[in-house]
Amino acid sequence: MFNRNLTLDQVDPDVWAAIQKEDVRQEQHIELIASENYASPAVMQAQGTQLTNKYAEGYPGKRYYGGCEYVDVVEQLAIDRLKQIFGAEAANVQPNSGSQANQGVYMAVLKPGDTVLGMSLAEGGHLTHGASVNASGKLYNFVPYGLDADEVLDYAQVERLTKEHKPKLIVAGASAYALHIDFERMARIAHDNGALFMVDIAHYAGLVAGGAYPNPVPHADFVTSTTHKSLRGPRGGVIMMKAEVEKAVNSAIFPGIQGGPLMHVIAAKAVAFKEALSPEFQDYAQQVVKNAKVLADTLVKRGLRIVSGRTESHVMLVDLRPKGITGKEAEAVLGQAHITVNKNAIPNDPEKPFVTSGIRLGTPAMTTRGFKEAEAELTANLIADVLDNPRDEANIAAVRARVNELTARLPVYGN
């Protein structure tokens, strides 16, 4: 039998030591990677439970294994709460990731070689929206759409390509697009031309849940998402859909692309969805957007360019060319100052993908730890201070000291 009193630090000191160092890093650094956030202690506790021991192939009430009466309760709670948050007719909480959620929809409604419209990765889309290096781009005939001359989603291009290529499915959503997406307009283009409409809100889900970003569920046939990022849950995926396609989607996930679901993760999803239904989460989502606006506006005042001219969400792309520094260099020097970002290509980027001319910034994590407009403005100025003098080690050290003061005042996990 196992001894409950035998803890990780005793069983595996090497793993424990690495985890402790990561805990310190998360507490000390300002996290600005748009796809990252902090899960609550309750979410992490749920994910660390004995539910990891249970196989539960199938769905609540229709399992291929015995002993599922309690995991059935947990999964049904997750389904019901997710539907309540977004107003969905049906939902599947079993996808292990956002990528698998997208793959599940594709498997449910497409055949290899079918034509699909998706946002170009180079202009803000995601790998799973038809990038040539991804399975989606290898299995299906994806036609990319992008931005217009003002770096706004080119709806006229979407309509033109739809009429020309007659896709079976149109995919909306992005990993690096700062503005609102007109889901109603996209749905009209799709449905008027006989196409199905899917929206990937992996980045925006928490904002949608909090009423700070448009909800695509009333307009789309399928809505996929991750459960981490702005939703602050465990790493995983979900699919929401119209009731008439629920059976096809469920079959695509299991037995189509997955076997037994991760019940400990589904428990953590259920907890996160309960948190997302709270008034406090509504306030959080609104603050994420407020912080992003201040961050973007301050960076512009300091001589940087924001792609699309502004942000209407949690995320922004920063064009670094005015500062004469690449995204790769900026990521490294900001990291030395304890500000964590990721290099990111900008539209029509002349640099290679591993170098880039931009960085992507997001405010979900900083907002979770209690940053408001004043801290967002300070953070933007600290970023600009580093980028103005990226090779001045004394300057970087001074910024790092100010970052450490700020993060010590507003810890991620307080008492």
Curated annotation (Swiss-Prot):
Gene, per the UniProt record: glyA2
Cytoplasm listed as a keyword: yes
InterPro entries cross-referenced by the UniProt entry: PyrdxlP-dep_Trfase, PyrdxlP-dep_Trfase_major, PyrdxlP-dep_Trfase_small, Ser_HO-MeTrfase, Ser_HO-MeTrfase-like, Ser_HO-MeTrfase_PLP_BS, SHMT-like_dom
Listed cofactors: pyridoxal 5'-phosphate
Residues binding (6S)-5,6,7,8-tetrahydrofolate, per UniProt: L121, G125, H126, L127
Protein's job: Catalyzes the reversible interconversion of serine and glycine with tetrahydrofolate (THF) serving as the one-carbon carrier. This reaction serves as the major source of one-carbon groups required for the biosynthesis of purines, thymidylate, methionine, and other important biomolecules. Also exhibits THF-independent aldolase activity toward beta-hydroxyamino acids, producing glycine and aldehydes, via a retro-aldol mechanism.
Main EC class the enzyme belongs to: transferase
Broad class of where this protein is predominantly found: cytoplasm
UniProt protein name: Serine hydroxymethyltransferase 2
Species name: Bordetella parapertussis (strain 12822 / ATCC BAA-587 / NCTC 13253)
Catalytic activity: (6R)-5,10-methylene-5,6,7,8-tetrahydrofolate + glycine + H2O = (6S)-5,6,7,8-tetrahydrofolate + L-serine
Subunit structure: Homodimer.
EC number: 2.1.2.1
Cell compartments where the protein resides: Cytoplasm
Modified residues (N6-(pyridoxal phosphate)lysine): K229
GO BP, sorted A to Z: glycine biosynthetic process from serine; tetrahydrofolate interconversion
Family: Belongs to the SHMT family.
PROSITE patterns documented for this protein: SHMT
Site (Plays an important role in substrate specificity): H228
A cellular component term, taken from the record's GO annotations: cytosol
